[in-house]
């Protein structure tokens, strides 16, 4: 535990205050909640993925309920009470969507994470994204490491307090979280383990290894469904005009050339491309072409 704790202390200064900064901006639109199921499994092949026994067991399970039972039985052997597998979709560091999987969402989930914008102040998700090791946490440590500054006049401190209180009320007082980027998407998948124990001292390196084994197995099974769902939503969200724009830049056409094809001005082409860059969270047309090709939108 000591080595893990030292790592947590080393990154605490990097994370301090940043959840407050994320929460300070008012939201123009609510975060969308996207549910994934088993229907899309296998749409996206992962030929280089490691062979994990638990992942194969999940793949051969006959139902969502059976998959949930498999993970729950493994969870109890490790000392944790809940496991959640979810993904956040980011655009310029702003959370746009929360992806949940039917088989790996705790039965206690009731929508507060989105309803109360907890995703904006949850220091665990930020920590998991910037750290190359699992985050081992307890509520006391989260509260201590993210105390608001004396000159902080925003509503972020109250939002963080509300999140931590909800965690405590739900018996989620300590745990482990880690994250993996989902290739070809703007998603980051998170594996979250929680327990009612008040401090993180009970979590040993062996416990972390067990959590990694379970979470990576779930990720191997479920990430293709995240990718397929993300692609489907991206395609469905494009108008025919936007698809033609993307085809044009993929072919190397200039704004003027694309405008001639679509019977519109180069200025209008530039305007819509800027909107697409903002939507997909990229800085230029090269990155836009790369991402839309990876997503198989064109």
Annotate each language-model stretch with its function.
Residues 254-287:
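Recognition helix of helix-turn-helix DNA-binding domains
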Residues 210-226:
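Signal-transmission/dimerization alpha-helices at domain junctions
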Residues 285-296:
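Short, basic, alpha-helical segments at the C-terminal edge of helix-turn-helix-like DNA-binding modules
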Residues 224-241:
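Regulatory hinge/linker segments at domain boundaries
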Residues 180-195:
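Sensory-domain boundary capping and coupling elements
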Residues 4-10, 34-42, 53-58, 72-183:
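Regulatory input/activation interfaces that engage signals or partners
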Residues 241-245, 255:
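The N-cap/first-turn positions of alpha helices
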Residues 195-208:
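Regulatory loop-to-helix N-cap segments in sensory/regulatory domains
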């Amino acid at each position: 535990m000591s080595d893990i704790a030292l790592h947590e202390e080393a990154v605490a200064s990097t994370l301090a205050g940043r959840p407050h900064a994320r929460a300070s901006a008012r939201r123009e639109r609510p975060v969308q909640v996207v549910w994934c199921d088993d229907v899309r499994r296998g749409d996206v092949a992962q030929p280089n993925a490691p062979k994990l026994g638990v992942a194969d067991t999940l793949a051969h399970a006959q139902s969502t309920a059976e998959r949930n039972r498999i993970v729950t039985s493994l969870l109890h052997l490790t000392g944790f009470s809940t496991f959640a597998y979810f993904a956040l979709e980011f655009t310029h560091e702003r959370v746009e969507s929360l992806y949940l999987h039917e088989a790996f969402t705790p039965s206690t989930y009731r929508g507060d994470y989105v309803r109360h914008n907890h995703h904006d102040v949850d220091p665990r998700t930020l920590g998991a994204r910037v750290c190359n090791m699992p985050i081992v946490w307890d509520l006391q440590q989260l509260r201590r490491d993210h105390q608001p500054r004396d000159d902080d006049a925003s509503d972020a401190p109250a939002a963080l307090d509300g999140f931590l209180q909800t965690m405590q009320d739900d018996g989620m007082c300590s745990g482990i979280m880690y994250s993996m980027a989902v290739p070809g998407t703007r998603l980051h998948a998170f594996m979250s383990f929680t327990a009612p124990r008040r401090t993180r001292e009970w979590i040993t390196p062996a416990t972390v290894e067990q959590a990694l084994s379970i979470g990576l197995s779930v990720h191997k099974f479920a990430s293709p469904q995240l990718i397929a769902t993300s692609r489907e939503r991206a395609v469905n969200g494009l108008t025919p005009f936007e698809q033609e724009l993307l085809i044009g830049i993929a072919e190397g056409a200039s704004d003027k050339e694309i405008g001639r094809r679509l019977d519109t001005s180069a200025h209008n082409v530039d305007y819509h491309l800027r909107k697409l860059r903002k939507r997909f969270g990229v800085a230029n047309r090269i990155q836009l072409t790369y991402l839309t090709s990876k997503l198989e939108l064109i």
